[in-house]
Amino acid sequence: MSAFIIGSTGLVGAQLLKVAAESNKFETVHTVSRRPVDGRDKVQGVVETDTAKWPEVIRENSKGVRTFFSAFGTTRADAGGVENFKKIDYGINYECAKAAKEAGIETFVLVSSLGANESSMLFYLKSKGKLENDIIALEFPRTIIIRPGALLGKRQKSQGIANEIFQKWGNMVKGTPFKFTAYPITGEEVAKVAVHLASEPLTQGDGPVVKAVGTSELDHLVKSLE
């Protein structure tokens, strides 16, 4: 069985690549990214700077792939505004998900966000919620949505002063009774949970399986995997 990852150069995605490549559940791990990924055994990476071509790369490189992970995302500041954010964070993710569905992927894992809700008054959370709902509507045999809180770890690019403050606070409260104020979790922990859940046997039921994993369950799973 093989896996495919987009967002493999980000905080969570880089850890996903590492964990998936080290897992005995996957024979090959495919990626498509705008810059090269760390070379590892089992990893077959395609560098394509034009993200509009990613869906075709996915269709052409998904033979034997049963699991797809998306940790791809951006911020409104990096995107250069609301409309570009939609095109990148929502648009690229959704087009890649459609390509994965067409390629016969069985399990789709989306790293989303705490508070994602299409009815939210906050643009970021509203967009994340719409992405979740639209991917669910594609009806993969199994869809897993992971909604982490404050993501801890080293980023290749600063996400702004607000994010830096939130991350510092998350580091302070992680493992304390005050963790509920940020629900901090490392990129590596998210990756381990994602690979663990995606590796569970897929049972054929009456219809598509949708599993949403919030902060409390994430915390429990992280502890169980230690």
UniProtKB/Swiss-Prot annotation:
It comes from the Eukaryota. GO terms for cellular component: mitochondrial outer membrane. The keyword Membrane applies. It is a peripheral membrane protein. GO terms for biological process: import into nucleus. Keywords: Membrane, Mitochondrion, Mitochondrion outer membrane, Transit peptide. InterPro entries: NAD(P)-bd_dom, NAD(P)-bd_dom_sf. It is found in: Mitochondrion outer membrane. Coiled coil: none annotated. Gene3D superfamilies: NAD(P)-binding Rossmann-like Domain. Belongs to the FMP52 family. This is Protein FMP52, mitochondrial. The lineage of its organism: Eukaryota, Fungi, Dikarya, Ascomycota, Saccharomycotina.
